[in-house]
């Protein structure tokens, strides 16, 4: 697939200005030049042209926001001055696997003031004596050359773009944790409500027991009252019998007195 068609497919019905990343690896470039890429990609930040048969970058449009450019496994042997002219904010440049032989071919990169990382793996220039010292001296703005700084300390795996992605992932995890904490809080509140309901049930049962106790006590009092009434009735009957007995006794005494007369 040629480069023009690949760019058309990568757009996916978007306008060039809406594209921030463009990967054209392994497509075919006619005459070893960039084709189909225009200055309309004003917001492009990442461009990958790995193994597309490039010989020159002379057709590269001006991309003011481009930060990372992948040009590994091509046949570029010079003409890097176009990079400084067209890509003023470039920070990462990968030229591994190209035909760069001399330190002098890298001189145009001095104008890339924002350049922090340069990769030249598998280029003949890396075989020169004092290669690393010479490149760092030529390009003092560099922080990392072939993945290591001046003190041979390895570069971190993540660059600014990857860090941004990591921050988004951390935010999502934080939201999930907050959501889990909220759910736990809701469960605790629900448990507290259940405990309150149980306490209310226990109190209700105790109240019922108290009422039942009062009823029983009242019932016993009623029984005691009935017994008292029975005793009172018995006493009344006894008094009546005694009075009847006394009346009969008086009557007999009166009758006896009459007979004596």
UniProtKB/Swiss-Prot annotation:
It is found in: Nucleus. A motif (Nuclear localization signal) lies at residues 249-252. One of its GO terms (biological process) is regulation of apoptotic process. Residues 149-261 are annotated as: Disordered. The modification Phosphothreonine is found at residue 254. The modification N6-acetyllysine is found at residue 86. PROSITE patterns: LRR (PS51450). One of its GO terms (cellular component) is perinuclear region of cytoplasm. Residues 123-161 form the LRRCT domain. Interacts with histones H3 and H4. Interacts with KLF5; this interaction induces promoter region-specific histone incorporation and inhibition of histone acetylation by ANP32B. PANTHER family: ACIDIC LEUCINE-RICH NUCLEAR PHOSPHOPROTEIN 32, ACIDIC LEUCINE-RICH NUCLEAR PHOSPHOPROTEIN 32 FAMILY MEMBER B. This is Acidic leucine-rich nuclear phosphoprotein 32 family member B. It comes from Bos taurus. The gene is ANP32B.
